[in-house]
Amino acid sequence: GFRRLTEGGTVYADSRYDYLQTTTPVSLATLTTGAMPSTHGVIGSRWVDYTTNRTVELTAGRKGPGAYHLIAPTLAETLLRHAPDSRAVTIAPEAVSAVVTAGHGGEVFWLDSARCDWVTSPYYAAEVPEWIARSNRERYNLSYISGEWRTLLERGRYLNTRNYDIALSGKSKKDKDQSGSGRLKLRSDFERMLYTPAGNTAVLGLAKQAIAQYRLGEDKIPDLLNVCLDSPRRISEAYGPESIEVEDMYYRLDRDLADFLTFVFAQVKDGSVTVVLTSDHGTSPAFDAGAEEADRF
């Protein structure tokens, strides 16, 4: 998946964000509007309004999650303004990611934390389309969730050394390094979805359904599909970038991307689709990385 993009496309290895803080909503707004935070108005998921001394929630409003505080037009909005017959679809696990990426228009879907269903809000539509409602009724997302997370590859093929909850293939569950620390308790379907590679698989699965249901890219009118993957950030924050959990997630994401790209290029004529893969921020070594980082200084 990643190799197909790097070898078949253009890689901008020195790109960076010229501001702080590069949190997810801030940088997603920058990516989708092309504007700096001082222009697009998103400075965090919440902040304190110094004129009222009240906390402002980025996406909270009377009509449910929406782009109430995003003041610059997004790519989706601009496309729909100039080509009203286009479709702009945005899919993300988290409401904030979906809302900020989409802006004020288009079809926007995210995961409900209670039932793991795909939902939208009255800000965008009265209800989800029937093909999503049917998937929700059939509890299709639960098919992605497993009670156990086991490494995709044999333990010896991993470069990272830390593991907490993941089961190491090729070792007995009784082995000490496989017992896990219980650092992250996955008590709900929503957590099992977003704190494991299943989150990526589910999002890309819905993206494929959207392409098929809406027949995106099949005519001369341009369409836009925004896909946000929040699970890599959540897994990295939960386990640390040096963890086997993070490394395994990227191996699985590579396969998910390969499957998704194969599907996309099978549906759309060659040369008539542009794929952009980017990130809202990077990561830093864990605070307790210790001796592994000592040789940097």
Segments the model singles out, each with a brief description of its role:
Residues 8, 78, 82, 206-214, ...:
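Generic, well-ordered alpha-helical scaffold segments in large soluble proteins
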Residues 35-221, 229-237:
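His/Asp/Glu-rich, glycine-adjacent segments
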Residues 2, 24-28, 71-75, 203, ...:
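Stable alpha-helical elements in mature extracytoplasmic
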Residues 252-294:
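Metal-dependent active-site segment of extracytoplasmic phospho-/sulfohydrolases and closely related
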Residues 1-29, 34-38, 87-90:
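Short, structured active-site-proximal loop/turn typified by the sulfatase FGly-forming signature C/S-X-P-X-R
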Residues 1, 103-114, 239-247, 282-297:
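Short secondary-structure boundary/capping segments
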Residues 14, 87-93, 226, 276-278:
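A structural signal for short, well-ordered beta-strand segments and their strand-loop junctions
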Residues 1, 15-18, 61-66, 190-197, ...:
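Second-shell loop/turn segments in exported
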